[in-house]
């Protein structure tokens, strides 16, 4: 299955899931625009459509839909365009504002990046919408971290940060995200012990 097909299949899955959970038609329209915007750079920048970052916009949205039951199109749209791992894949804020509006752009701008010195403080003091986007976006990166080629240093830092920052924030935010982070932290700790 080629990149366009994999991207289109993910877009269809996002729309189908959103529709089945009751996201209104206008929300699905905004979400579809956001997903397409999040995929644009990936389609050109990533040579391999099986790269762990390729389907990230849709996977982050699906975490919010399936695990949180989030139906807020602004939160879902923000999750589709936030990128905390690869600056080359980030959608510029001006473009987000132009395509998706001020509210989505403001939410994206409020999501702290994992390398921020004040990450824990920023997440703890953020409103729930910011925390939901940050937790879902990061969880997807963490879930696919084992696919990062020979990057043991990233894995160690990611596990430490997930355990000490993201997991406690998940506890304050949503029970299902807490379960997901707890499971990931346990599983990844075992992987690190073996490597």
Model region roles, listed by residue range:
Residues 1-195:
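Active-site helical microenvironments for divalent-metal-assisted chemistry
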